[in-house]
């Protein structure tokens, strides 16, 4: 639904569903226009043009409380079928001999993708403490598939499994079975934390709050930085040694 054609398609899709009420967790005038033209009578949305002033957690909590009279915590939980988790554990041999680590290698843009060499260096370091298996998560686009291929072609290829072309229904129980996640600030960091997996989030170019709102999240910042935000451009300064130190602490290695 990108561009003018995408907007028109989205309006058409919404009209077909005859929604009577909408809640828009965004300050964009584009979404305000879309929901109006879709014929939705009751439209609730964040205040327009106030994105820079917003705390993503508190703004959402207040919005939900005001319009739905519900109090929500900032520690989201994603529940999946326990039988599916156990089946996956058996299918992919999640045994205790190994430490099972999800690597969130992708990102919504190039400034959020920490160079893959830094992930490989972390893999080298953590593998000196315990045998590890790595589960490689990224998008299906050619750029991110190339990143996955670089990891698979490293010295760790025998202990890697790509999740790149799996359905989400197959991916979630795999992530749930992991002992740790190390991820760029991408959807996989939010998913793994919500599944209850301790997650190290590599913060390079977005507000720190995106990577520490959950008790399951441990942020790693660019060297020399005590905070990050939009346009911090810190991906080259993420230190694999720091990831390793925090991973050892979380895993009690």
Task: Locate the predicted segments by residue.
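Catalytic machinery of carbohydrate-active enzymes
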Residues: 1-253
């Amino acid at each position: 639904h990108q561009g003018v054609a995408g907007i028109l398609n989205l309006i058409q899709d919404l009209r077909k569903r005859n929604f009577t009420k909408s809640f828009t967790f965004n300050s964009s005038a584009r979404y305000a226009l879309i929901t109006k033209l879709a014929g939705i009578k009751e439209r609730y949305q964040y205040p327009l043009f106030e994105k820079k002033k917003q705390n993503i957690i508190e703004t959402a909590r207040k919005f939900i409380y005001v319009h739905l009279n519900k109090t929500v915590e900032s520690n989201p939980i994603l529940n999946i079928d326990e039988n599916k988790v156990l089946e996956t554990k058996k299918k992919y041999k999640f045994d205790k001999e190994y430490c099972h680590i999800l690597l969130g290698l992708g990102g919504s843009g190039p400034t959020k993708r920490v160079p893959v060499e830094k992930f490989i260096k972390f893999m080298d370091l953590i593998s000196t403490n315990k045998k590890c298996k790595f589960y490689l998560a990224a998008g299906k686009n050619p750029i991110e598939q190339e990143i996955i291929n670089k990891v698979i072609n490293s010295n760790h290829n025998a202990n890697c499994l790509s999740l790149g072309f799996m359905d989400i229904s197959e991916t979630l129980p795999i992530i749930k079975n992991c002992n740790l996640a190390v991820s760029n600030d991408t959807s996989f960091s939010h998913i793994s934390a919500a599944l209850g997996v301790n997650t190290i989030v590599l913060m390079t170019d977005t507000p720190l709050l995106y990577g520490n709102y959950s008790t399951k999240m441990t942020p790693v910042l660019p060297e020399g930085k005590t905070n990050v935000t939009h346009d911090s451009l810190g991906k080259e300064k993420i230190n694999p040694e720091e990831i390793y130190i925090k991973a050892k602490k979380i895993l009690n290695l």
